[in-house]
């Protein structure tokens, strides 16, 4: 059988006659492919005795190894010829010709706004915390005083993986984890993605929140109000008219929504806030008789739309370069 193997010298001449990498690739398939020359020889080994299989198998493997060496060597030669040819062309290239204009990337408006918010609160002594986007209902709901029967836990509002795991609906899941793992005083913001089953001009299934949390002795609503007023004046770069109106959130008691007066003389809601519910503090093993806390939640897309006069939230995620390149 081995007498039927082509001489490696004969195949080497075939290899040397190839002038392109594609021709060499075709030759490699011819001899080493799944249905190639060597594969057919290997098939014939099955009809031989065990002793002959060992002898002829060794010869075929040596032949295959030598052939691979010749193919790889010639490929290196062809690559060198191709590079040399390219260099010759480049010598005749006119460097004074006007090149194609490169597009200059810009920071996404949501990324820019989150960075701006972080910088503001870092100057006030807050720490930035990030964390799980996939969480359990215990941290996303139960510990935040959102009971099993609460409508926010329904399938139409929340993306569930199974009975216990979900895509977080709020960054508050990291607030409760931080309170469980750290001792007061605590002063953090939690920027990140959150998910809710909603999609229209003012809602997307994924959006961004920045939540703030302060826990210490004698924290009161005045501290919360001052921080929010300072932030809104900073963010909108002017003296904006702000109002706090009573609201309800399961995880805060003395809860409020914060509105600003728009250019159209209408009040627009920009964030929610409140004093942390004593039950939430207890759930995090913090004594509500010794400590108090306040929290606020900023919808990043919402305030970005108000800042830049954008009417449809969906444009942030449509990859429209004409829209995105405005934010430089």
Curated annotation (Swiss-Prot):
Domain of life where this protein originates: Bacteria
EC number in record: 6.1.1.20
Cofactor: Mg(2+)
An MF annotation (GO) of this entry: ATP binding
Uppermost EC category: ligase
Family note: Belongs to the class-II aminoacyl-tRNA synthetase family. Phe-tRNA synthetase alpha subunit type 1 subfamily.
Protein name, UniProt field: Phenylalanine--tRNA ligase alpha subunit
UniProt organism field: Buchnera aphidicola subsp. Baizongia pistaciae (strain Bp)
């Amino acid at each position: 059988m081995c007498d039927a193997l082509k001489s490696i010298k004969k195949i080497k001449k075939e290899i040397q006659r190839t002038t392109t990498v594609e021709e060499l690739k075709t030759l490699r398939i011819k001899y080493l492919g799944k249905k190639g020359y060597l594969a057919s020889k290997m098939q014939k080994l099955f009809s031989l005795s065990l002793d002959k299989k060992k002898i002829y198998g060794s010869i075929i493997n040596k032949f295959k190894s030598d052939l691979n060496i010749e193919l790889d060597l010639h490929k290196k030669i062809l690559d060198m010829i191709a590079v040399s040819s390219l260099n010759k062309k480049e010598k005749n290239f006119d460097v004074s010709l006007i090149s194609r204009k490169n597009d200059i990337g810009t920071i996404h408006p949501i990324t820019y706004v989150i960075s701006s918010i972080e910088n503001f609160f870092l100057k006030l002594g807050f720490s930035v915390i990030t964390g799980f986007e996939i969480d359990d209902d215990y941290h996303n709901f139960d510990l935040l005083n959102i009971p099993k029967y609460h409508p926010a836990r329904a399938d139409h509002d929340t993306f569930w993986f199974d009975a216990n795991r979900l895509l977080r609906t709020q960054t508050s899941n990291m607030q409760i984890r931080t309170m469980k793992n750290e001792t007061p005083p605590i002063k953090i913001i939690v920027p990140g993605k959150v998910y809710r089953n909603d999609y229209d001009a003012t809602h997307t299934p994924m959006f961004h929140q920045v939540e703030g949390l302060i826990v210490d002795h004698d924290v009161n609503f005045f501290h919360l109000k001052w921080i929010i007023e300072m932030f809104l004046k900073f963010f909108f770069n002017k003296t904006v008219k702000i109002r706090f109106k009573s609201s309800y959130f399961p995880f805060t008691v003395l809860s409020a929504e914060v509105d600003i007066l728009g250019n159209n003389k209408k009040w627009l809601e920009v964030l929610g806030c409140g004093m942390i519910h004593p039950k939430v503090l207890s759930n995090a093993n913090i004594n509500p008789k010794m400590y108090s806390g306040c929290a606020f939640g900023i919808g990043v897309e919402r305030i970005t739309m108000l800042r830049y006069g954008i009417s449809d939230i969906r444009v942030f995620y449509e990859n429209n370069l004409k829209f995105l390149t405005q934010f430089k």
